[in-house]
């Protein structure tokens, strides 16, 4: 037993003597596919000395001969390099450009009769087919890794959602907030490498919008996109379901080419107008109750499966006065929590209900406001002026009656005046005739007082 110990010691010494250089601990370095990696090798002497880099098959990659860089017959011949400026400092790095998954290997640096081993693991992370996805579609991220590795992956979306997995990660029903830079971290052997992937979610800025208008006002519908593409081509259509209609109908169809919009077909009632450039913009000449309702604009992009959607709603308000009834009405899709009110200006609401129509009987004169509000915030307002009761529609008849009475009284008055005047003239004429007769008979005693001087007693 004791005689075997010296032999084993001798065998170990012989093996160590046969080794060309001592091997230090192996380092692990993670790299990204397509990137550049730098593997370090440091000598104890701060000067340029001879070194060699080899792969696990002992095939030389590169080394030096004096101040010259020499390369071996490895597959990295055209992608391998070193930093000559660091040689005088005792640093002899191996630089590998445009990394590939198959570059994963153990690389050996021989310097000063020592060996430094570096294990390089190259990973790649790619998105499925395209990084431009329609809203609602699924995103799949696939990790490429070297054989024998067992990495874990964790990704964080722009909206802060964390997704964990192995070599495949899937995210369903992408939302607009998922558009942006995704940060993914790959962990292997307590080392990590970070990937950044830009994902563009193709969508409208708003999933739905609502427009509030008074009857007769012009309506503007806008459909801005949440992304920018230099050459955007596709086609679209707006379908509209009026509140009073039994079915929806197509209001307009259009083409989109290089951000230029051209109308293919438009209905005559209503006759929409469409802008010729992005963002998509539609104009309805007048907001009328028969147009109130909901629409759905679809946009199909070239080379993309599926369509973009945006819902748009139109609410129309009308305030009217008919005889002694003041009415406020709204048409279109409204929330049950919305409040419809009628109030006299600068006064409390006369009536306020969660309904689509309210009214006031025998309203006071003044400016009345019809208000549609949500939790105190006014969404739509229409004003109507109520005139005093004497200015009601019966005014012309009253004036006719009053005028007739006044005319009759004037006629009667004039008749009486002319009758009295005529009678007065007749009596005066009779008196003058009597005077002339008396004078002719020389009976001056019967004359008026002014003729008494010429009268003689009978």
Swiss-Prot record:
Residues 26-125 form the Ig-like V-type domain. InterPro entries: CD4 (IPR000973), CD4-extracel (IPR015274), Ig-like_dom (IPR007110), Ig-like_dom_sf (IPR036179), Ig-like_fold (IPR013783), Ig_C2-set (IPR008424), Ig_sub (IPR003599), Ig_sub2 (IPR003598). The keyword Transmembrane applies. Palmitoylation and association with LCK contribute to the enrichment of CD4 in lipid rafts. Phosphorylated by PKC; phosphorylation at Ser-433 plays an important role for CD4 internalization. The chain crosses the membrane at residues 397-418. Disulfide bonds join 41-109, 155-184, 328-370. Highly expressed in T-helper cells. The presence of CD4 is a hallmark of T-helper cells which are specialized in the activation and growth of cytotoxic T-cells, regulation of B cells, or activation of phagocytes. CD4 is also present in other immune cells such as macrophages, dendritic cells or NK cells. It is a single-pass type I membrane protein. GO terms for molecular function: coreceptor activity; enzyme binding; extracellular matrix structural constituent; identical protein binding; immunoglobulin binding; interleukin-16 binding; interleukin-16 receptor activity; lipid binding. GO terms for cellular component: clathrin-coated endocytic vesicle membrane; early endosome; endoplasmic reticulum lumen; endoplasmic reticulum membrane; external side of plasma membrane; membrane raft; plasma membrane; T cell receptor complex. Residues 419-458 are cytoplasmic. Residues 427-455 are annotated as: HIV-1 Vpu-susceptibility domain. Changing residue 265 to A: Has no effect on the interaction with MHCII. Impairs recognition by OKT4 antibody. SUPFAM superfamilies: Immunoglobulin. Integral membrane glycoprotein that plays an essential role in the immune response and serves multiple functions in responses against both external and internal offenses. In T-cells, functions primarily as a coreceptor for MHC class II molecule:peptide complex. The antigens presented by class II peptides are derived from extracellular proteins while class I peptides are derived from cytosolic proteins. Interacts simultaneously with the T-cell receptor (TCR) and the MHC class II presented by antigen presenting cells (APCs). (Microbial infection) Primary receptor for human immunodeficiency virus-1 (HIV-1). Down-regulated by HIV-1 Vpu. Acts as a receptor for Human Herpes virus 7/HHV-7. PANTHER family: T-CELL SURFACE GLYCOPROTEIN CD4. The Ig-like V-type domain mediates the interaction with MHCII. This is T-cell surface glycoprotein CD4. It comes from Homo sapiens (Human).
